[in-house]
């Protein structure tokens, strides 16, 4: 058996983000003045209070496996933050802590999508979305937006894209990469509501 990687992985397209980052590095190494817009790397150092908290955790032997959905104290703090800053009320059992957005999105898609299900992606979208859907054996279906609509889709576009195979709509606000913000999702979500 010579094949190590699965066909599923081998058939994924290469990451556009990693390809752009490699090209930017190459040009920078050639002495060109490059502003890298590919990877979302912070342009600031980790704040001291976070570094100190990490050191304190290590010194206190706070180093065992965490609960799968996150520490209760952290989930309670997240609930408090949502209430204080956003006026949203959640219970700790409604919060899942993960290593980042990509993991959370991949987990959600894996548990929601069956082979052959359609997932609607509002384009432009984060480059990982289509690969995440393909890994779940779903079909990524693009709904295009443009500068004239501030890179937002309309309810009629969404309604036209929905078919009996549609299982999920992936829409993020603020959008990555366009930055557009849906101030209200009520009007855009109307086509997804069950008819009475």
Report the location of each language-model feature.
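Short conserved AdoMet
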Residues: 29, 59, 113-114, 163, ...
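Glycine/Thr-rich phosphate-binding loops of Rossmann-like dinucleotide-binding domains
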Residues: 45, 105, 129, 178-179
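Flexible low-complexity scaffold tracts in large eukaryotic assembly proteins
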Residues: 173-176
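Short N-terminal helix/helix-N-cap motif within the alpha/beta-hydrolase-1
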Residues: 100-106, 123-124, 179
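Single conserved hydrophobic/aromatic residue that forms the stacking wall/gate
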Residues: 186-196
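PLP-dependent aminotransferase-like
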Residues: 92-93, 110-171, 181-185
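N-terminal small-domain helix-loop-helix segment of the aminotransferase-like
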Residues: 2-100, 107
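Secondary-structure boundary/capping motif
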Residues: 16, 46, 150, 178-182
């Amino acid at each position: 058996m010579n094949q190590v990687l699965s066909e599923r992985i081998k058939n994924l397209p290469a990451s556009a983000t990693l390809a752009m980052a490699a090209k930017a590095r190459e040009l920078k190494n050639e002495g060109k003045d490059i502003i890298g817009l590919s990877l979302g790397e912070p342009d600031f150092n980790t704040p001291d209070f976070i570094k100190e908290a990490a050191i304190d955790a290590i010194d206190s032997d706070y180093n065992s496996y965490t609960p799968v959905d996150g520490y209760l104290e952290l989930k309670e703090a997240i609930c408090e933050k949502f209430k204080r800053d956003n006026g949203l009320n959640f219970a700790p059992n409604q919060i899942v802590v993960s290593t980042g957005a990509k993991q959370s999105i991949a987990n959600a898609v894996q548990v929601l999508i069956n082979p052959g299900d359609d997932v609607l992606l509002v384009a432009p979208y984060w480059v990982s979305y289509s690969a995440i859907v393909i890994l779940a054996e779903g079909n990524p279906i693009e709904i295009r937006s443009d500068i004239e609509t501030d890179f937002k889709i309309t309810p009629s576009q969404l309604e036209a894209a929905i078919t009996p195979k549609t299982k999920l709509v992936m829409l993020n606000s603020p959008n990555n990469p366009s930055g557009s913000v849906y101030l209200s999702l009520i009007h855009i979500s109307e086509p997804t509501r069950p008819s009475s």
